[in-house]
């Protein structure tokens, strides 16, 4: 049975279709755009993890020679990431407690520009070594999928642990077991 829609019914139907599309499309579109094509799976435990020099946001430079024969924690984060905001204070505690025992750390900000990362580090009084993962550094330290990402490079230069997502405080503290 064909029914001719009155103008009010047609307008209402278009409005409902637009509203339904608005509810479904933005999350899908945001999810499709949020995942950069250059993200990789986590490094495999046991594989060699080569390092490259990196300019630090607070000045100075990360030199891979600093990490030879030592444990290095690589930490991919962003100033806008709520999970990173929960984990970063724990990373600072780990840095404060273990750097005297030889722990090395390199936090890699994936912010679009270095300015938000610098402002965030200053605001939170974080002192762990941090670099901005710009296009050049991205080639040496490609960001694994997910955020935050924590990778431990053992004294032998191989991946000892690789974690995607927020770590609980006790999990961050346990990273010291690799020392």
Role assignments for model-derived ranges:
Residues 1-14, 18-27:
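N-terminal secretory signal peptides
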Residues 28-51, 119:
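N-proximal helix/coil linker or "cap" segments that precede and/or mark the start of modular domains
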Residues 52-71:
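A short beta-strand-turn-helix
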Residues 71-72, 148:
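Alpha/beta-hydrolase fold active-site loops
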Residues 76-90:
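Conserved redox-active cysteine motifs that mediate thiol-disulfide chemistry
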Residues 88-107:
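Conserved helix-turn-beta segment immediately C-terminal to the redox Cys motif
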Residues 103-114, 128-134:
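Thiol-based oxidoreductase modules, predominantly thioredoxin-like and allied folds used
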Residues 124-126, 134-175:
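Thiol/disulfide oxidoreductase modules built on the thioredoxin-like
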